[in-house]
Amino acid sequence: MKILQYALLACLLVSILGDDDDEENEGAAGSDDAGATPTALSKPAATSAEGNTAAKNSGGDIKQPKQELPEPSSKGQKKPRLPKRCLFKPEQGNCAGSRFLPRWWYNPETESCEPFTYPVCNKKNEAFVSCTLCMNMCMRNKRGREKAKWIRKVCRKSPKVKSG
């Protein structure tokens, strides 16, 4: 009986702490969105945890992020911006006893999607369910047949999934 009580208490504490983190992140993300500029691909560490939670929703509904229009760079050339979902970075968590799901994230340094394991206790939904979906949404430097060939090449590999 005590084990059940401890398990319920642990679940309650995790949900309270998770809700507090969500409220803090949503408040910070709301203030950052007004003057947000695209993150340069050469600086992936500039993405913060607040930016990663901006696309979060409640109730388990999956919403597709809107495709953002290209914004001119300093040289006058148009450089396409990545959707927020493509800026997601897998983070280390401490979800003790949690199940882990295989998911994909876009790595702008390699310009490809990479697998990782995703703890079920996280409420974020920015990670991609499949490599193909990830590559189709985030890869901007190739078009048409070249893009399809690259997606098949990257997604056909079966790399080791790293823990996130």
Curated annotation (Swiss-Prot):
PROSITE patterns: BPTI_KUNITZ_2. One of its GO terms (molecular function) is toxin activity. Disruption phenotype: The tick attachment time is prolonged and the engorgement body weight is decreased after gene silencing by RNA interference. No significant difference is observed in the feeding period and survival. Residues 27-36 have a biased composition (Low complexity). InterPro entries: Kunitz_BPTI, Kunitz_BPTI_sf, TFPI/VKTCI-like. Gene3D superfamilies: Pancreatic trypsin inhibitor Kunitz domain. Pfam families: Kunitz_BPTI. Residues 86-138 form the BPTI/Kunitz inhibitor domain. It is found in: Secreted. May be studied for future application as a vaccine, since it impairs tick attachment time and engorgement body weight. Induction: By blood feeding. GO terms for cellular component: extracellular region. One of its GO terms (biological process) is envenomation resulting in negative regulation of voltage-gated potassium channel activity in another organism. Expressed in salivary glands. Residues 1-18 form the signal peptide. Disulfide bonds join C86-C138, C95-C121, C113-C134, C131-C155. Residues 20-84 are annotated as: Disordered. SMART domains: KU (SM00131). Anticoagulant protein that may inhibit serine proteases. The anticoagulant effect of this recombinant protein on blood clotting is found both in the recalcification time (RT) and the activated partial thromboplastin time (APTT) tests, indicating it acts in the common pathway of blood coagulation. This is Anticoagulant protein rhipilin-1. It comes from Rhipicephalus haemaphysaloides (Tick).
